[in-house]
Amino acid sequence: MTEYRNFLLLFITSLSVIYPCTGISWLGLTINGSSVGWNQTHHCKLLDGLVPDQQQLCKRNLELMHSIVRAARLTKSACTSSFSDMRWNWSSIESAPHFTPDLAKGTREAAFVVSLAAAVVSHAIARACASGDLPSCSCAAMPSEQAAPDFRWGGCGDNLRYYGLQMGSAFSDAPMRNRRSGPQDFRLMQLHNNAVGRQVLMDSLEMKCKCHGVSGSCSVKTCWKGLQDISTISADLKSKYLSATKVIPRQIGTRRQLVPREMEVRPVGENELVYLVSSPDYCTQNAKQGSLGTTDRQCNKTASGSESCGLMCCGRGYNAYTEVLVERCQCKYHWCCYVSCKTCKRTVERYVSK
């Protein structure tokens, strides 16, 4: 772990970043954001990560900041879960608000993190509205479609369309509206991927219901529109990451647009992630490319997917070691009311890449 942190520090201090990744610098709020009261305007300048336009939004909407700090934490957690079985070492996200080249350039990985962050911000705000945590919003409006005979609209839906998207997009897109945030191509890429993330979030709205009736008969249901969990949204975006389109800038009329590099006759789809710079294979350690390599990464000997030793180890082979796990076992419930368990030891074999 110490070697990894030293290597990451070398990345941050020794490289000149080609593309500034200000669009997701706010993920650095996970470091000390929870310790700030967010009840005075000067708090908006206390921590690194917020660009001037986001600081202004913070000053006008201090009550949002607890949700945004939570969104930063959820984004990192979702990224960790989504890429734990991939060669790309998601740990570079921990260096926010400063990033290494794997996220500081317009890579496929940056496209995923940017879109996920945009989705999670709006998700966190919409949920906070429904939970009563924000004085400026409340539950979502009742759906306009007619309720079926077996249910009625009610409950408290996540306020996505009328508040979560509005405030989330204002926050996420603010850095990329400023020309000083980087080259236009990079800003166009981030704005596009932000929109993709929010579209996936909108598509995740689903009907959720609560049953009423004698002895749980569910003769009547009260239903509302709620968002799916972040893990589901992250999984959808990972699928888009795997099929992301490499793009190049092109002047079309008076507008500069991004078009697919390989199929320039086809416009970029509104629902596909795009990237500007091809990623390395992340097999070996390379500071200039932002690759930590896969040496000592755990792999699965029997799997066939990205977590398999064949793919994770890049053909270098793997080392095996045994680990003794101490677990609770043979648990019994006693009336009333406690559970007693024995302690068991189990030896498992682990594999790490050479």
UniProtKB/Swiss-Prot annotation:
Its main location: secreted. A lipid is attached at S215 (O-palmitoleoyl serine). Palmitoleoylation is required for efficient binding to frizzled receptors. Depalmitoleoylation leads to Wnt signaling pathway inhibition. Disulfide bonds join C129-C137, C139-C156, C209-C223, C211-C218, C283-C314, C299-C309, C329-C344, C331-C341, C336-C337. GO terms for cellular component: cytoplasm; extracellular space; plasma membrane. GO terms for biological process: camera-type eye development; canonical Wnt signaling pathway; cell fate commitment; cell migration; cell migration involved in gastrulation; cell-cell adhesion; central nervous system development; convergent extension. It comes from the Eukaryota. It is found in: Secreted, Extracellular space, Extracellular matrix. Residues 1-23 form the signal peptide. GO terms for molecular function: cytokine activity; frizzled binding; protein heterodimerization activity. Glycans are attached at N32, N39, N89, N300. InterPro entries: Wnt, Wnt_C, Wnt_CS. Keywords: Developmental protein, Disulfide bond, Extracellular matrix, Glycoprotein, Lipoprotein, Secreted, Signal, Wnt signaling pathway. PANTHER family: PROTEIN WNT, WNT RELATED. Belongs to the Wnt family. Ligand for fzd5, a member of the G-protein coupled frizzled receptor family. Plays a role in early eye development, possibly through wnt non-canonical signaling. Promotes eye formation, at least partially, by antagonizing the Wnt/beta-catenin pathway. In addition, promotes coherence of eye field cells, potentially contributing to the coordinated morphogenetic behaviors of cells in the nascent eye field. This is Protein Wnt-11. It comes from Danio rerio (Zebrafish).
